[in-house]
């Protein structure tokens, strides 16, 4: 039995083909482009509100009321401790930054309605993160380690630059700009350890001890001999002088004795006459 007209099998298949899947992304992109093209293109000094382009507010102001078909944008000044640095469509001004001393920061320029606070590093620190003239993070200047000296001192935007000590000099580290020369051991000292770029030469005083221990007894013996010779010479000189003076002493004694004898003889004669 033949099927009725119009009740036969369909001339097309209901199963999706590869071409159908390829059309889906194209349709999606087409709709997206239509939506983008439907939005108005605002100028640089305007901002988009719905389907309208509204004029931006000047630096130091914020949007109090957006524009409409019959009115423009209503702007208001930024309250204290807030600012806007550029033309904007912001409903609120931005809060002023705070320079935290615990982060090594100090206030370089106070905040205004059109400019944020400018922070710089306190002395002894340098800026690690710089945004124009504003610094957000500071680090302490590097201290040169032993064996190095300060070649260039740190500033508020640059760290300390260190350089190695040359041979014959040393540094204990720190903030000194010049390395110190090694100590030269004297003629009576011995070099125990040669200096390095971080330590000085070490000298020994044992040689001095040996020299003193040898010279001191010699000096004592020499002084004793010299004293003995001086005393002996003085004794000999005294003896020779005494011998030379003996005749004069005897003559003087005889001269003194004669008057005594004469006086005694005269007294005897007087006593005899009186008797």
UniProtKB/Swiss-Prot annotation:
Question: Which post-translational modifications are recorded for this protein?
Answer: N-glycosylated.
Which CDD domains does this chain map to? Answer: TNFRSF14 (cd10582)
Alphabetized GO MF terms? virus receptor activity
What InterPro entries does this protein's entry cite? TNFR/NGFR_Cys_rich_reg, TNFR_14, TNFRSF14/UL144_N
Tissue-specificity statement: Expressed at mucosal sites including colon and pulmonary epithelial cells. Expressed in naive T cells.
Task: Tell me the subunit arrangement.
Answer: Interacts with TRAF2, TRAF3 and TRAF5. Interacts (via CRD1/TNFR-Cys 1) with CD160; this interaction is direct. Interacts (via CRD1/TNFR-Cys 1) with BTLA; this interaction is direct.
Name it: Tumor necrosis factor receptor superfamily member 14
Q: Which organism is it from?
A: Mus musculus (Mouse)
